[in-house]
């Protein structure tokens, strides 16, 4: 199951760029708890867009299943740059919640 979440990052001239996290989750049913939980974050991709910004190099991505499997957390640490030479360090956390039916929701 794939879900995406966007976050805004401020850059010069009162602009902001969009950092988008797209992740694929594996939810499984737990009979004793009578609900689904995230058992694995299969993949995570993080992109940046707006005002010519891009990653200076691929960001470091850390995937964690927390809160007993109710939440998938993607941590992103990287540097964005634009053609003018402006650079900015970006550190973001994206959280996704697994509802009782196994659907993945943005928090």
Regions found by a protein language model. Name each.
Residues 1-107:
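Mature secreted bioactive peptide module from preproproteins
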